[in-house]
Amino acid sequence: MKIHLIGICGTGMGSLAGLLKAAKHDVRGSDTDVYPPMSTQLSEQGIEVMNGHRPENLDWQPDVVVVGNVCSKDHVEVVAAQARNLRLTSFPALLEELFLRDGHALVVSGTHGKTTTSSLAAFVLAAGGRDPSFLIGGVPQNFGRGWRLGREHGVFVVEGDEYDTAFFDKGSKFFHYQPKTVILTSVELDHVDIFDSLEAVKAAFAKFVALIPHDGLLIVAADSPGALDVAKSAVCRVETYSVGADIHADWVARPIAQRAGGRTVFEVEKRGEHVGTFDTGLPGAYNLANCLSVIAAASGLGLSADEISRGIRRFAGVKRRQETRGVAQGVTVVDDFAHHPTAVRETLKALRGRYGGGRIIAVFEPRSATSRRAIFQADYAEAFSTADEILIAPVFHPEKAPAGDRFDPELLASDLRGRGVMARCFTEVDKIVAHLADSAAAGDTVVVMSSGSFGGLHDKLLSRLGDAVVPAGPGDLGGLRDLLDEAKLDYPDLDEHLNEILVLRDPARKVVGCVAMELHGDAGLLCALATLPARRGEGLGWMLAEAALGRARRRGARRVYLVTATASDFFAEKFGFKMVERAMVDAEILESSQFRGVSSGTTMVLDLDS
Protein backbone atom coordinates (compact mmCIF):
# COMPACT_ATOMS: atom_id res chain seq x y z
CA MET A 1 0.00 0.00 0.00
CA LYS A 2 1.19 3.54 -0.79
CA ILE A 3 0.84 5.62 2.38
CA HIS A 4 1.45 9.35 2.87
CA LEU A 5 1.85 10.72 6.41
CA ILE A 6 1.20 14.40 7.11
CA GLY A 7 3.55 15.52 9.89
CA ILE A 8 5.84 12.52 9.49
CA CYS A 9 8.63 13.90 11.70
CA GLY A 10 6.52 13.90 14.86
CA THR A 11 7.45 11.24 17.41
CA GLY A 12 4.29 9.19 16.87
CA MET A 13 4.06 9.61 13.10
CA GLY A 14 7.75 8.86 12.65
CA SER A 15 7.39 5.63 14.60
CA LEU A 16 4.30 4.69 12.60
CA ALA A 17 6.26 5.34 9.40
CA GLY A 18 9.01 2.95 10.52
CA LEU A 19 6.47 0.28 11.43
CA LEU A 20 4.71 0.62 8.06
CA LYS A 21 8.02 0.45 6.19
CA ALA A 22 8.99 -2.71 8.08
CA ALA A 23 5.66 -4.19 7.01
CA LYS A 24 6.68 -3.60 3.34
CA HIS A 25 4.45 -0.61 2.60
CA ASP A 26 5.57 2.27 0.38
CA VAL A 27 5.81 5.14 2.87
CA ARG A 28 6.43 8.83 2.31
CA GLY A 29 5.46 11.95 4.18
CA SER A 30 5.78 15.67 4.69
CA ASP A 31 6.59 18.05 7.53
CA THR A 32 7.71 21.59 8.22
CA ASP A 33 10.11 20.58 11.00
CA VAL A 34 12.52 18.31 9.15
CA TYR A 35 15.61 17.96 11.34
CA PRO A 36 17.59 15.25 13.18
CA PRO A 37 17.24 12.89 14.84
CA MET A 38 13.89 11.96 13.26
CA SER A 39 14.82 13.08 9.73
CA THR A 40 17.99 10.96 9.94
CA GLN A 41 16.11 7.91 11.24
CA LEU A 42 13.56 8.14 8.43
CA SER A 43 16.25 8.60 5.79
CA GLU A 44 18.15 5.56 7.07
CA GLN A 45 14.99 3.50 6.57
CA GLY A 46 14.60 4.72 2.99
CA ILE A 47 11.53 6.83 3.78
CA GLU A 48 11.24 10.00 1.69
CA VAL A 49 10.43 13.15 3.64
CA MET A 50 9.16 16.23 1.79
CA ASN A 51 10.10 19.51 3.45
CA GLY A 52 7.01 21.70 3.75
CA HIS A 53 3.31 21.10 3.12
CA ARG A 54 1.99 21.63 -0.42
CA PRO A 55 -0.53 19.98 -2.78
CA GLU A 56 2.17 18.58 -5.08
CA ASN A 57 3.43 16.37 -2.25
CA LEU A 58 0.50 14.12 -3.18
CA ASP A 59 1.42 13.84 -6.88
CA TRP A 60 2.65 10.29 -6.26
CA GLN A 61 -1.02 9.31 -5.76
CA PRO A 62 -0.91 7.47 -2.42
CA ASP A 63 -3.64 4.97 -1.60
CA VAL A 64 -4.22 6.61 1.76
CA VAL A 65 -3.29 9.87 3.49
CA VAL A 66 -2.78 9.70 7.26
CA VAL A 67 -3.93 12.79 9.17
CA GLY A 68 -2.71 13.57 12.68
CA ASN A 69 -4.86 15.29 15.27
CA VAL A 70 -2.83 18.48 14.84
CA CYS A 71 -4.16 18.83 11.28
CA SER A 72 -7.24 20.96 10.72
CA LYS A 73 -9.77 20.41 7.95
CA ASP A 74 -8.31 23.36 6.01
CA HIS A 75 -4.72 22.00 6.04
CA VAL A 76 -3.31 22.41 2.54
CA GLU A 77 -2.62 18.69 2.03
CA VAL A 78 -5.96 17.65 3.55
CA VAL A 79 -7.76 19.93 1.08
CA ALA A 80 -5.63 18.61 -1.79
CA ALA A 81 -6.30 14.99 -0.83
CA GLN A 82 -10.05 15.56 -0.75
CA ALA A 83 -9.93 17.33 -4.12
CA ARG A 84 -8.18 14.28 -5.60
CA ASN A 85 -10.57 11.82 -3.91
CA LEU A 86 -7.74 10.25 -1.91
CA ARG A 87 -8.74 8.28 1.18
CA LEU A 88 -8.13 10.08 4.47
CA THR A 89 -7.59 8.14 7.65
CA SER A 90 -6.14 8.69 11.10
CA PHE A 91 -3.07 7.26 12.84
CA PRO A 92 -5.17 5.06 15.22
CA ALA A 93 -7.54 3.88 12.49
CA LEU A 94 -4.67 2.79 10.22
CA LEU A 95 -2.94 1.04 13.11
CA GLU A 96 -6.16 -0.85 13.79
CA GLU A 97 -6.69 -1.71 10.13
CA LEU A 98 -3.19 -3.05 9.43
CA PHE A 99 -1.90 -4.41 12.74
CA LEU A 100 -4.43 -4.81 15.56
CA ARG A 101 -7.41 -6.73 14.23
CA ASP A 102 -5.92 -10.22 14.18
CA GLY A 103 -3.42 -10.21 17.05
CA HIS A 104 -3.47 -9.75 20.81
CA ALA A 105 -3.43 -6.04 21.62
CA LEU A 106 -1.90 -5.21 25.00
CA VAL A 107 -2.97 -1.61 25.54
CA VAL A 108 -1.42 0.48 28.30
CA SER A 109 -3.75 3.33 29.24
CA GLY A 110 -4.14 5.89 32.01
CA THR A 111 -3.31 9.48 32.87
CA HIS A 112 0.24 8.68 33.99
CA GLY A 113 2.97 6.14 33.27
CA LYS A 114 1.79 4.94 29.86
CA THR A 115 5.08 5.32 28.01
CA THR A 116 7.28 3.74 30.67
CA THR A 117 4.83 0.89 31.34
CA SER A 118 4.27 0.06 27.66
CA SER A 119 8.04 0.17 27.03
CA LEU A 120 8.66 -2.15 29.96
CA ALA A 121 5.92 -4.54 28.81
CA ALA A 122 7.40 -4.69 25.31
CA PHE A 123 10.90 -5.36 26.62
CA VAL A 124 9.78 -8.03 29.10
CA LEU A 125 7.94 -9.84 26.31
CA ALA A 126 10.92 -9.54 23.95
CA ALA A 127 13.40 -10.69 26.61
CA GLY A 128 11.08 -13.63 27.29
CA GLY A 129 11.26 -14.71 23.64
CA ARG A 130 7.70 -13.72 22.70
CA ASP A 131 8.72 -11.51 19.73
CA PRO A 132 6.16 -8.73 20.29
CA SER A 133 5.33 -5.80 18.05
CA PHE A 134 4.94 -2.39 19.62
CA LEU A 135 4.20 1.25 18.93
CA ILE A 136 5.01 3.62 21.78
CA GLY A 137 4.98 7.40 22.19
CA GLY A 138 8.57 7.47 23.43
CA VAL A 139 11.90 5.76 22.80
CA PRO A 140 12.68 2.74 25.03
CA GLN A 141 16.42 2.76 25.76
CA ASN A 142 16.72 -1.00 25.16
CA PHE A 143 15.34 -0.73 21.63
CA GLY A 144 16.48 2.73 20.52
CA ARG A 145 13.23 3.45 18.66
CA GLY A 146 9.52 3.64 19.38
CA TRP A 147 8.35 0.77 17.20
CA ARG A 148 9.00 -2.88 16.45
CA LEU A 149 7.42 -5.35 14.04
CA GLY A 150 7.39 -8.78 15.63
CA ARG A 151 5.61 -12.06 15.01
CA GLU A 152 2.52 -11.83 12.81
CA HIS A 153 -0.73 -12.10 14.81
CA GLY A 154 1.29 -12.10 18.05
CA VAL A 155 1.18 -9.65 20.94
CA PHE A 156 1.13 -5.98 19.95
CA VAL A 157 1.92 -3.52 22.76
CA VAL A 158 0.45 -0.09 22.16
CA GLU A 159 0.25 3.04 24.27
CA GLY A 160 -3.44 3.90 24.57
CA ASP A 161 -4.14 7.63 24.55
CA GLU A 162 -7.50 9.17 25.48
CA TYR A 163 -6.84 12.27 23.33
CA ASP A 164 -9.08 12.78 20.30
CA THR A 165 -8.20 11.08 17.03
CA ALA A 166 -8.54 13.62 14.18
CA PHE A 167 -10.62 16.58 13.07
CA PHE A 168 -13.07 14.12 11.49
CA ASP A 169 -13.05 11.70 14.44
CA LYS A 170 -13.39 13.28 17.87
CA GLY A 171 -13.44 9.94 19.69
CA SER A 172 -10.45 8.95 21.81
CA LYS A 173 -7.57 7.26 20.02
CA PHE A 174 -7.76 4.11 22.11
CA PHE A 175 -11.27 3.32 20.84
CA HIS A 176 -9.50 1.97 17.72
CA TYR A 177 -7.10 -0.38 19.47
CA GLN A 178 -9.06 -3.66 19.74
CA PRO A 179 -7.92 -4.25 23.35
CA LYS A 180 -7.49 -7.79 24.65
CA THR A 181 -5.30 -7.09 27.69
CA VAL A 182 -5.40 -3.61 29.23
CA ILE A 183 -3.30 -1.97 31.93
CA LEU A 184 -5.07 1.03 33.48
CA THR A 185 -2.54 2.99 35.54
CA SER A 186 -4.66 5.91 36.75
CA VAL A 187 -7.54 8.18 35.78
CA GLU A 188 -7.32 11.90 36.57
CA LEU A 189 -8.35 15.13 34.88
CA ASP A 190 -5.99 15.86 31.98
CA HIS A 191 -6.15 17.21 28.41
CA VAL A 192 -8.32 20.05 29.64
CA ASP A 193 -8.46 21.46 26.12
CA ILE A 194 -10.85 18.63 25.17
CA PHE A 195 -12.19 17.32 28.52
CA ASP A 196 -14.08 19.83 30.67
CA SER A 197 -14.31 17.64 33.77
CA LEU A 198 -13.06 14.48 35.43
CA GLU A 199 -16.43 12.88 34.68
CA ALA A 200 -15.86 13.44 30.96
CA VAL A 201 -12.45 11.77 31.22
CA LYS A 202 -13.93 8.82 33.11
CA ALA A 203 -16.69 8.44 30.52
CA ALA A 204 -14.08 8.03 27.76
CA PHE A 205 -12.13 5.45 29.76
CA ALA A 206 -15.32 3.58 30.68
CA LYS A 207 -16.27 3.30 27.02
CA PHE A 208 -12.77 2.01 26.29
CA VAL A 209 -12.63 -0.72 28.95
CA ALA A 210 -16.08 -1.90 27.86
CA LEU A 211 -14.43 -2.85 24.54
CA ILE A 212 -12.32 -5.56 26.21
CA PRO A 213 -13.95 -8.92 25.32
CA HIS A 214 -15.23 -11.37 27.93
CA ASP A 215 -12.07 -13.49 27.65
CA GLY A 216 -9.80 -10.44 27.99
CA LEU A 217 -8.11 -8.99 31.07
CA LEU A 218 -8.18 -5.56 32.72
CA ILE A 219 -5.35 -4.82 35.16
CA VAL A 220 -6.22 -1.73 37.20
CA ALA A 221 -4.41 0.35 39.83
CA ALA A 222 -6.13 -0.13 43.18
CA ASP A 223 -4.89 3.23 44.48
CA SER A 224 -6.64 5.25 41.75
CA PRO A 225 -10.30 5.94 42.63
CA GLY A 226 -10.96 7.12 39.09
CA ALA A 227 -9.52 3.93 37.60
CA LEU A 228 -11.57 1.74 39.96
CA ASP A 229 -14.74 3.61 38.96
CA VAL A 230 -13.94 3.06 35.30
CA ALA A 231 -13.27 -0.65 35.87
CA LYS A 232 -16.93 -1.15 36.78
CA SER A 233 -17.74 -0.85 33.06
CA ALA A 234 -15.61 -3.88 32.15
CA VAL A 235 -17.22 -7.18 31.11
CA CYS A 236 -13.90 -9.06 31.28
CA ARG A 237 -11.86 -10.38 34.20
CA VAL A 238 -10.49 -7.57 36.37
CA GLU A 239 -7.33 -7.79 38.51
CA THR A 240 -6.12 -5.00 40.77
CA TYR A 241 -2.57 -4.09 41.80
CA SER A 242 -0.96 -1.99 44.52
CA VAL A 243 2.42 -1.26 46.10
CA GLY A 244 2.37 -2.01 49.84
CA ALA A 245 -0.31 -3.62 51.95
CA ASP A 246 -2.28 -0.46 52.78
CA ILE A 247 -4.73 -1.01 49.92
CA HIS A 248 -6.34 -4.38 49.21
CA ALA A 249 -5.41 -5.70 45.76
CA ASP A 250 -4.99 -8.97 43.86
CA TRP A 251 -1.34 -8.19 43.06
CA VAL A 252 0.83 -6.63 45.77
CA ALA A 253 4.47 -5.50 45.62
CA ARG A 254 6.55 -4.89 48.75
CA PRO A 255 10.00 -3.26 48.58
CA ILE A 256 12.53 -5.24 50.61
CA ALA A 257 15.92 -3.67 49.80
CA GLN A 258 17.62 -0.69 48.18
CA ARG A 259 20.81 -1.31 46.21
CA ALA A 260 23.56 0.85 44.79
CA GLY A 261 22.58 3.03 41.86
CA GLY A 262 19.01 3.48 43.08
CA ARG A 263 17.91 -0.08 42.35
CA THR A 264 14.98 -1.55 44.32
CA VAL A 265 14.43 -5.20 45.20
CA PHE A 266 10.80 -6.11 45.80
CA GLU A 267 8.63 -9.15 46.43
CA VAL A 268 5.35 -9.81 44.66
CA GLU A 269 2.33 -11.74 45.86
CA LYS A 270 -0.87 -12.63 44.06
CA ARG A 271 -3.81 -13.10 46.42
CA GLY A 272 -1.43 -13.93 49.27
CA GLU A 273 0.77 -16.40 47.35
CA HIS A 274 4.42 -15.59 46.66
CA VAL A 275 5.08 -14.99 42.96
CA GLY A 276 8.75 -14.01 42.99
CA THR A 277 11.44 -11.50 43.88
CA PHE A 278 12.24 -8.78 41.36
CA ASP A 279 14.84 -6.05 40.92
CA THR A 280 14.39 -2.77 39.03
CA GLY A 281 16.49 0.28 38.32
CA LEU A 282 13.41 2.46 37.78
CA PRO A 283 13.21 4.97 40.65
CA GLY A 284 10.16 5.79 42.75
CA ALA A 285 7.12 4.00 44.17
CA TYR A 286 5.06 4.83 41.09
CA ASN A 287 7.56 2.94 38.93
CA LEU A 288 7.25 -0.07 41.25
CA ALA A 289 3.53 0.09 40.48
CA ASN A 290 4.32 0.22 36.75
CA CYS A 291 6.54 -2.86 37.14
CA LEU A 292 3.82 -4.68 39.07
CA SER A 293 1.22 -4.01 36.37
CA VAL A 294 3.58 -5.48 33.76
CA ILE A 295 4.21 -8.53 35.96
CA ALA A 296 0.45 -9.10 36.10
CA ALA A 297 0.01 -8.62 32.34
CA ALA A 298 2.99 -10.80 31.38
CA SER A 299 1.80 -13.54 33.75
CA GLY A 300 -1.57 -13.43 32.04
CA LEU A 301 0.23 -13.93 28.73
CA GLY A 302 2.00 -17.05 30.01
CA LEU A 303 5.45 -15.81 31.02
CA SER A 304 7.06 -17.36 34.08
CA ALA A 305 8.25 -15.31 37.05
CA ASP A 306 11.88 -15.99 36.07
CA GLU A 307 11.29 -14.78 32.51
CA ILE A 308 9.60 -11.62 33.75
CA SER A 309 12.30 -11.00 36.36
CA ARG A 310 15.09 -11.06 33.76
CA GLY A 311 13.30 -8.50 31.62
CA ILE A 312 12.49 -6.14 34.49
CA ARG A 313 16.07 -6.27 35.76
CA ARG A 314 17.57 -5.40 32.38
CA PHE A 315 15.08 -2.69 31.41
CA ALA A 316 16.98 0.57 30.96
CA GLY A 317 14.11 3.05 30.96
CA VAL A 318 12.80 5.47 28.35
CA LYS A 319 14.27 8.59 26.83
CA ARG A 320 12.84 11.77 28.40
CA ARG A 321 11.57 9.87 31.46
CA GLN A 322 14.07 10.72 34.21
CA GLU A 323 16.75 10.38 31.55
CA THR A 324 20.23 11.43 32.63
CA ARG A 325 21.39 13.67 29.80
CA GLY A 326 24.85 14.19 31.25
CA VAL A 327 27.02 15.07 34.23
CA ALA A 328 29.21 18.18 34.19
CA GLN A 329 31.30 19.54 37.07
CA GLY A 330 29.44 17.15 39.35
CA VAL A 331 26.03 18.53 38.31
CA THR A 332 23.62 15.89 36.98
CA VAL A 333 21.24 17.10 34.26
CA VAL A 334 18.03 15.07 33.94
CA ASP A 335 15.36 15.33 31.24
CA ASP A 336 11.76 14.50 32.11
CA PHE A 337 8.46 14.77 30.25
CA ALA A 338 6.47 15.59 33.42
CA HIS A 339 3.93 18.36 32.88
CA HIS A 340 0.92 17.25 34.97
CA PRO A 341 1.08 18.10 38.72
CA THR A 342 0.87 14.44 39.74
CA ALA A 343 3.74 13.52 37.41
CA VAL A 344 5.79 16.46 38.70
CA ARG A 345 5.27 15.42 42.32
CA GLU A 346 6.14 11.76 41.73
CA THR A 347 9.17 12.60 39.59
CA LEU A 348 10.62 14.92 42.23
CA LYS A 349 9.99 12.31 44.93
CA ALA A 350 11.80 9.66 42.87
CA LEU A 351 14.75 11.94 42.12
CA ARG A 352 15.05 12.80 45.79
CA GLY A 353 15.36 9.09 46.51
CA ARG A 354 17.99 8.57 43.81
CA TYR A 355 20.02 11.79 44.17
CA GLY A 356 19.20 12.74 47.77
CA GLY A 357 22.68 14.01 48.63
CA GLY A 358 22.46 17.39 46.88
CA ARG A 359 19.91 19.96 45.87
CA ILE A 360 17.10 19.17 43.45
CA ILE A 361 16.61 22.12 41.08
CA ALA A 362 13.49 21.91 38.89
CA VAL A 363 13.25 23.88 35.64
CA PHE A 364 9.67 24.00 34.34
CA GLU A 365 8.26 25.02 30.97
CA PRO A 366 4.42 25.26 30.86
CA ARG A 367 4.14 23.90 27.33
CA SER A 368 1.40 21.27 27.07
CA ALA A 369 -2.27 22.08 26.53
CA THR A 370 -2.91 21.19 30.17
CA SER A 371 0.01 23.03 31.78
CA ARG A 372 -0.58 26.31 29.96
CA ARG A 373 -4.05 26.61 31.54
CA ALA A 374 -4.83 27.86 35.03
CA ILE A 375 -6.84 24.84 36.16
CA PHE A 376 -3.82 23.31 37.95
CA GLN A 377 -2.29 26.59 39.19
CA ALA A 378 -2.61 25.67 42.89
CA ASP A 379 -1.73 22.02 42.27
CA TYR A 380 1.61 22.99 40.72
CA ALA A 381 2.55 24.93 43.86
CA GLU A 382 1.95 21.81 45.92
CA ALA A 383 3.73 19.53 43.43
CA PHE A 384 6.90 21.65 43.14
CA SER A 385 7.16 22.39 46.87
CA THR A 386 9.51 19.44 47.49
CA ALA A 387 12.23 20.81 45.20
CA ASP A 388 15.00 23.01 46.59
CA GLU A 389 14.72 25.59 43.82
CA ILE A 390 12.27 26.16 40.95
CA LEU A 391 13.04 28.05 37.75
CA ILE A 392 9.97 28.80 35.63
CA ALA A 393 9.93 29.66 31.93
CA PRO A 394 7.19 31.62 30.13
CA VAL A 395 4.06 29.85 28.94
CA PHE A 396 4.77 28.34 25.51
CA HIS A 397 2.42 29.83 22.90
CA PRO A 398 0.27 31.57 25.51
CA GLU A 399 -2.23 32.62 22.84
CA LYS A 400 -3.43 29.00 22.73
CA ALA A 401 -5.03 29.42 26.17
CA PRO A 402 -7.75 32.01 26.87
CA ALA A 403 -6.38 35.03 28.75
CA GLY A 404 -8.73 34.44 31.66
CA ASP A 405 -7.80 30.77 31.88
CA ARG A 406 -4.04 31.02 31.42
CA PHE A 407 -1.39 29.64 33.76
CA ASP A 408 0.52 32.39 35.59
CA PRO A 409 4.26 31.65 36.15
CA GLU A 410 4.73 34.67 38.43
CA LEU A 411 1.85 33.54 40.65
CA LEU A 412 3.40 30.07 40.93
CA ALA A 413 6.76 31.58 41.90
CA SER A 414 5.06 33.77 44.51
CA ASP A 415 3.12 30.81 45.95
CA LEU A 416 6.30 28.75 46.20
CA ARG A 417 8.25 31.54 47.89
CA GLY A 418 5.39 31.74 50.38
CA ARG A 419 6.10 28.09 51.17
CA GLY A 420 9.78 28.83 51.75
CA VAL A 421 10.94 27.46 48.39
CA MET A 422 13.35 29.42 46.18
CA ALA A 423 11.49 30.23 42.95
CA ARG A 424 12.20 32.57 40.04
CA CYS A 425 10.72 33.30 36.63
CA PHE A 426 12.85 33.82 33.53
CA THR A 427 12.02 35.22 30.11
CA GLU A 428 14.68 33.37 28.10
CA VAL A 429 16.35 29.96 28.05
CA ASP A 430 19.83 31.51 27.90
CA LYS A 431 19.15 33.40 31.14
CA ILE A 432 18.13 30.15 32.84
CA VAL A 433 21.36 28.53 31.63
CA ALA A 434 23.45 31.45 32.89
CA HIS A 435 21.79 31.31 36.32
CA LEU A 436 22.34 27.56 36.64
CA ALA A 437 25.94 27.76 35.44
CA ASP A 438 26.66 30.31 38.17
CA SER A 439 24.70 28.69 41.01
CA ALA A 440 24.60 24.89 40.56
CA ALA A 441 27.21 23.02 42.58
CA ALA A 442 28.70 19.54 42.52
CA GLY A 443 26.13 17.08 43.85
CA ASP A 444 23.14 19.08 42.58
CA THR A 445 20.59 17.58 40.21
CA VAL A 446 18.90 19.80 37.62
CA VAL A 447 15.68 18.25 36.28
CA VAL A 448 14.30 19.90 33.15
CA MET A 449 10.53 19.39 32.89
CA SER A 450 8.85 20.07 29.56
CA SER A 451 6.76 18.27 26.96
CA GLY A 452 8.97 19.80 24.25
CA SER A 453 12.58 20.61 23.42
CA PHE A 454 12.75 23.64 25.79
CA GLY A 455 15.07 25.49 23.44
CA GLY A 456 17.85 22.92 23.83
CA LEU A 457 18.34 23.90 27.48
CA HIS A 458 19.91 20.56 28.46
CA ASP A 459 22.74 20.70 25.93
CA LYS A 460 23.31 24.42 26.46
CA LEU A 461 23.69 23.91 30.20
CA LEU A 462 26.03 20.93 29.87
CA SER A 463 28.14 22.85 27.37
CA ARG A 464 28.24 25.94 29.58
CA LEU A 465 29.30 23.94 32.64
CA GLY A 466 32.03 22.21 30.62
CA ASP A 467 33.68 18.78 30.81
CA ALA A 468 30.31 17.10 30.43
CA VAL A 469 30.04 13.30 30.41
CA VAL A 470 27.20 12.53 28.00
CA PRO A 471 26.03 9.72 25.70
CA ALA A 472 27.97 9.77 22.43
CA GLY A 473 26.25 11.00 19.28
CA PRO A 474 27.02 10.80 15.54
CA GLY A 475 28.78 14.17 15.74
CA ASP A 476 31.35 12.66 18.12
CA LEU A 477 32.58 9.94 15.74
CA GLY A 478 35.54 11.90 14.36
CA GLY A 479 36.75 12.95 17.79
CA LEU A 480 36.28 9.42 19.13
CA ARG A 481 38.34 7.86 16.36
CA ASP A 482 41.16 10.38 16.87
CA LEU A 483 41.14 9.83 20.63
CA LEU A 484 41.14 6.02 20.39
CA ASP A 485 43.85 6.05 17.72
CA GLU A 486 46.07 8.22 19.92
CA ALA A 487 45.50 5.86 22.85
CA LYS A 488 46.21 2.86 20.56
CA LEU A 489 42.81 1.35 21.40
CA ASP A 490 40.89 -0.59 18.78
CA TYR A 491 37.08 -0.43 18.75
CA PRO A 492 35.67 -2.14 15.61
CA ASP A 493 32.40 -0.86 14.10
CA LEU A 494 32.47 2.22 16.31
CA ASP A 495 29.44 3.82 14.64
CA GLU A 496 27.32 0.75 15.41
CA HIS A 497 28.20 0.89 19.12
CA LEU A 498 27.59 4.58 19.84
CA ASN A 499 24.78 3.72 22.24
CA GLU A 500 27.35 1.95 24.46
CA ILE A 501 29.76 4.89 24.63
CA LEU A 502 29.98 7.92 26.90
CA VAL A 503 32.11 10.90 25.93
CA LEU A 504 33.50 13.83 27.88
CA ARG A 505 33.33 17.11 25.98
CA ASP A 506 35.06 20.36 26.82
CA PRO A 507 33.18 23.71 26.56
CA ALA A 508 34.01 23.83 22.83
CA ARG A 509 32.29 20.42 22.46
CA LYS A 510 35.60 18.71 21.64
CA VAL A 511 35.82 15.07 22.76
CA VAL A 512 38.54 14.92 25.43
CA GLY A 513 37.65 11.54 26.95
CA CYS A 514 35.56 8.43 26.35
CA VAL A 515 34.53 5.11 27.85
CA ALA A 516 32.35 2.21 26.73
CA MET A 517 30.09 0.00 28.83
CA GLU A 518 28.99 -3.10 26.96
CA LEU A 519 26.22 -5.12 28.59
CA HIS A 520 25.98 -8.87 28.08
CA GLY A 521 23.16 -10.38 30.11
CA ASP A 522 23.76 -9.59 33.80
CA ALA A 523 27.40 -8.60 33.22
CA GLY A 524 29.08 -5.49 31.88
CA LEU A 525 32.44 -4.87 30.23
CA LEU A 526 34.14 -1.53 30.83
CA CYS A 527 36.45 -0.76 27.92
CA ALA A 528 37.80 1.95 25.60
CA LEU A 529 38.60 4.30 28.51
CA ALA A 530 40.78 7.10 27.15
CA THR A 531 41.55 10.79 27.74
CA LEU A 532 43.57 13.33 25.80
CA PRO A 533 47.21 13.36 26.96
CA ALA A 534 46.99 17.10 27.64
CA ARG A 535 44.11 16.53 30.08
CA ARG A 536 45.56 13.62 32.03
CA GLY A 537 45.96 14.09 35.75
CA GLU A 538 42.70 16.08 36.04
CA GLY A 539 40.52 13.20 37.23
CA LEU A 540 38.73 12.77 33.89
CA GLY A 541 39.32 9.01 33.85
CA TRP A 542 37.63 8.70 37.24
CA MET A 543 34.67 10.80 36.04
CA LEU A 544 34.22 8.62 32.95
CA ALA A 545 34.55 5.31 34.80
CA GLU A 546 32.14 6.48 37.53
CA ALA A 547 29.56 7.47 34.90
CA ALA A 548 29.95 4.14 33.07
CA LEU A 549 29.49 2.17 36.29
CA GLY A 550 26.40 4.24 37.10
CA ARG A 551 24.96 3.35 33.72
CA ALA A 552 25.70 -0.35 34.32
CA ARG A 553 23.92 -0.25 37.69
CA ARG A 554 20.86 1.49 36.25
CA ARG A 555 20.66 -1.08 33.47
CA GLY A 556 20.70 -4.07 35.78
CA ALA A 557 24.28 -5.38 35.59
CA ARG A 558 25.30 -7.48 38.59
CA ARG A 559 29.04 -7.27 37.92
CA VAL A 560 31.42 -5.41 35.63
CA TYR A 561 34.66 -6.72 34.13
CA LEU A 562 37.64 -4.93 32.64
CA VAL A 563 41.13 -5.77 31.40
CA THR A 564 43.95 -3.33 32.14
CA ALA A 565 47.69 -3.45 31.60
CA THR A 566 48.63 -0.43 33.72
CA ALA A 567 45.74 0.74 35.92
CA SER A 568 44.84 -2.20 38.17
CA ASP A 569 45.78 -0.25 41.31
CA PHE A 570 43.63 2.71 40.21
CA PHE A 571 40.51 0.57 39.67
CA ALA A 572 41.07 -1.35 42.90
CA GLU A 573 41.55 1.75 45.06
CA LYS A 574 38.95 4.05 43.47
CA PHE A 575 36.13 1.58 42.77
CA GLY A 576 36.84 -1.71 44.55
CA PHE A 577 37.65 -3.89 41.52
CA LYS A 578 39.33 -7.20 42.33
CA MET A 579 41.53 -9.43 40.19
CA VAL A 580 39.87 -12.52 38.75
CA GLU A 581 41.02 -15.46 36.64
CA ARG A 582 39.87 -15.29 33.02
CA ALA A 583 38.35 -18.75 33.43
CA MET A 584 35.89 -17.26 35.97
CA VAL A 585 34.60 -14.56 33.61
CA ASP A 586 31.00 -14.83 32.32
CA ALA A 587 30.83 -16.75 29.04
CA GLU A 588 29.07 -13.89 27.21
CA ILE A 589 31.85 -11.49 28.20
CA LEU A 590 34.55 -13.98 27.14
CA GLU A 591 32.92 -14.26 23.72
CA SER A 592 32.61 -10.51 23.16
CA SER A 593 34.86 -9.04 20.49
CA GLN A 594 36.27 -6.41 22.87
CA PHE A 595 37.32 -8.98 25.48
CA ARG A 596 38.73 -11.42 22.92
CA GLY A 597 40.69 -8.57 21.35
CA VAL A 598 42.75 -8.05 24.53
CA SER A 599 45.51 -10.66 24.74
CA SER A 600 47.34 -9.39 27.82
CA GLY A 601 46.67 -7.47 31.01
CA THR A 602 45.01 -7.96 34.37
CA THR A 603 41.38 -9.09 34.37
CA MET A 604 39.31 -7.47 37.12
CA VAL A 605 35.71 -7.63 38.34
CA LEU A 606 33.47 -5.40 40.45
CA ASP A 607 30.44 -6.93 42.18
CA LEU A 608 27.63 -4.35 41.87
CA ASP A 609 25.29 -6.23 44.21
CA SER A 610 27.55 -5.92 47.24
What do these predicted ranges mean?
Residues M1-M38, S43-V49, Q61, V65, ...:
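ATP-dependent carboxylate-amine ligase
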Residues L5, L19, F91-P140:
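Walker A (P-loop) phosphate-binding motif
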Residues S39-E44, M50, N57-V67, C71-S90, ...:
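Acidic, Mg2+-coordinating active-site environments of NTP-dependent enzymes
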Residues A468-L480:
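A short beta-loop-alpha structural element at the N-terminal edge
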Residues V503, K510-E518, A523-A530:
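Conserved beta-strand in the GNAT
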Residues L529-R536, T566:
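A short, internal acetyl-CoA/4′-phosphopantetheine-binding micro-motif in the GNAT/acyltransferase core
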Residues G537-G550, R554, L562:
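Conserved acetyl-CoA-binding loop-helix of GNAT-fold acetyltransferases
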Residues R554, R558, A565-Q594:
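Conserved active-site alpha-helix within GNAT-family acetyltransferase domains
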